[in-house]
Amino acid sequence: MKMKRSLQIAMFVILAFALTTSSAFAAVSKKNEKKSITLLNVSYDPTRELYVDYNAVFAKYWKKKTGQTVTVKQSHGGSGAQARSVIDGLEADVVTLALEYDVSAIEQKGLISKGWQSRLANNSAPYKSTIVFLVRKGNPKGIKDWDDLVKNDVKVITPNPKTSGGARWNYLAAWAYALKHNNNSDDKAKAFVKELFTHVPVLDTGARGSTTTFVEKGIGDVLLAWENEAFLAKKEYGDKFEIVTPSLSILAEPTVAVVTKNVQKHDTRQVATAYLDYLYTEEGQRVAARNFYRPINPKVALEYSKQFPKLNLVTIKDFGGWDKAQKTHFADGGTFDQIYLKK
């Protein structure tokens, strides 16, 4: 009996040791797993350079703060197309898109928590931009303002408003100019924008594609461009191009959000939230400014004030907000569909 009892005790000790050891190994493994984490940032077309720069800065900050190594993967394309990709299953932890409507489209599918606009400052728009013209050296066609775009011999490069956020800003800026110079007549604005699109030889799906068409393929006389994209082209290609600032443009406000459903699935909410929060710090704002986005932090904006020209700007509010603008101009059967004649 004593031998049997001793054997039972021995078996219990061995089992307990095995369970303890297994738990310890599991804990160590789990701890090691948390030493590194990966995020996916699904963004719009011309933010590649911005987020390569920012990701390195954020990773350094996060490592120092938490000891955790964070790797941020990037996905880029036309903003509308990117929003559709997330809706269709691309598992973004964060989205950094060209405009509010595209983020709201993801929210409407239940992937982003309601009220995302108010979670961060400036309606979750951490930096600003606008639309300018990029022309070839010497400005051979003498392009100075929007009305020059409809001269007989001018070819205009702009992306497709159905897929590109930048293209929608381009379109609305042109519409605003036409309204201003035609006593706010929507009919005359529609006619002007229709005429403008007859000068567009090709519609790329995103802003970077249009830049490639203009800069590398040599197609067109003027590129309607994000301001940061125009600055970047000048930086990379020197004196081959010039930037023309039109008399009127539009305040472009790219917006950001955590994709709630995906961060819950990936267990990345904490780092994803911090990733967007850090865009608003002085360091994050300087990264944006270095990449030719207009910072919203007053101190950093002052530091870079000489970099950005002063502009007369309309805002999306002048179009009744993005829901109304999208429905009126860019939804199926909207104004763009009515005026654009496919080549």
Which ranges hold each PLM region?
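Extracellular/periplasmic juxtamembrane helices and adjacent flexible linkers that interface
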Residues: 263-343
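N-terminal segment of the mature folded domain
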Residues: 31-164, 305, 341
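Short helix-loop capping/hinge motifs at secondary-structure junctions, enriched
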Residues: 138-144, 163, 176-184, 262-270
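Ligand-binding pocket segment of bilobal, Venus flytrap-like solute-binding proteins
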Residues: 181-247
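Sec-exported extracytoplasmic/periplasmic mature domains
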Residues: 55-64, 87-91, 100, 107-111, ...
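Residues embedded in well-ordered beta-strands
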Residues: 132-134, 242, 255-257
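Short, low-complexity disordered leader/linker segments with a strong preference
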Residues: 1-38
